Amino acid sequence: MCTFGRELFPALFILHMKNEELTIAYALLSFEELPADEQALVKLAEEATQTSYAPYSHFHVGAALQLEGNVRIAGSNQENAAFGAGTCAERSALFYAHSSHPEAAVEAIAIAARGTNGELTDCPISPCGICRQALLEAQNRAGKPIRVLLCGKRHIVRLTGIENLLPFAFNEIV
């Protein structure tokens, strides 16, 4: 039997690597179980779906941010025929918040959506990868975890810390 060197066949040694696990911490809640401030944030996200411009996907997303100092900001997805030129609700809210309140840390975000039938989605939706990265940047600037409320009619998922949405995040430029 041959003995292969790691330097010659590194892919073969993947089989012998130690497996690791990640745990994602979240709570599954009803709207009524949320504290009043989070209920208000969810309602604002739901309202923001009404300002969405989604003539192509017909999927209307709203996001609401809670900033330091009890400031709330809402944003919605804005589509464009040149698909890459559109903006997600989460980034609309984040970028407006930072441009209008640059020193205020983001404390929480609620995200809600209306499907093609015009109704709020039964199940929670979650941010795309680009929005997750933008949320991580906001969390890094704030220096503390952001609470995330993923909203659906059936239940709401609450996470604390963007790392629970984005394991193995791109976290710094060397």
PLM region spans:
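Zn2+-dependent cytidine deaminase-like catalytic core
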Residues: A74-V174
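Short, compositionally biased leader-like segments
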Residues: L15-K43
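Short glycine/proline-enriched turns and hinge-like loops at secondary-structure junctions
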Residues: Y56-H58, T87
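Short beta-strand scaffold segments in enzyme catalytic cores
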Residues: H58-L67
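Short, basic/aromatic recognition patches
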Residues: L41-A54
